Amino acid sequence: MTNAILEINGLHQYFEKGTPNENHALKGIDLQLREGEFVAIIGGNGAGKSTLLNSVAGSLPVSYGQVKIAGKDVTYQSVEKRAKLISRVFQDPRQGSAPLLTVEENLSLALKRGSWRNFWSSGVKKNERDVFKQKLASLGLGLENRLSAEIGLLSGGQRQAITLLMATMRQPELLLLDEHTAALDPQTSATVMQITDKIVREEHLTAMMITHNMQDALKYGNRLIMMDHGQIAIDLNAEQKQGLTVPDLLAMFKEKSGTALTDDAVLLSD
């Protein structure tokens, strides 16, 4: 039986608890991601998807419940402690790399897990450079010829593709993708999604992707979760979501939740 990489048990998240503005953002979430699962999580604004991802990442303290990664209880661990198990790609392409360092320096730093001491003491070795060239060439963007370019001079799509490589260089137990194509134009977004899918499949990674794009949620990954008001409304495996269209998904959501999805950010993303 395939191991559970992520286990969430009875997870509740409150904001401003005990005040007139109390928001019960997550309501007893139970969720497991098994090794090799690539789950896309969608839902309207306020559904709880970003709160869920931030709770897993450690950037939001858990109100109640438990989070385990690769069998380790990380419920009360900091973001820094969890970084040994998790890699995260943010929405902003500028957030995952050091703009004044070159492409190869950023990749080298990622390989050394952000250890500046190891980075400055050894620099970029020839064998590392050869690996970087090979990995960059596999992206099909010509970036293998830009190793010495400052990463801050690259386009958002190029930078996000490199950030994906950096995030997966050391085979994280869990890859978190936080609307990582939302800031890109449609054509670049499609390219980065294809690269994402390729990396996740070839590296046999376990990944959780937050997205507003229903087409991407249907096209990519082997599992789809739709959230509503802090709960999981729909949970489909690869076979169940195969052949579904956006209208099918919207109809399913209405049947499960009793209401139609009205968030334009989701409805217009296809």
Show where each model-derived region lies.
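Conserved ABC transporter NBD signature motif
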Residues: G65-D73, L236
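A short, flexible loop at the N-terminus of ABC-type nucleotide-binding domains that lies
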Residues: T2-I5, Y14-G28, S78
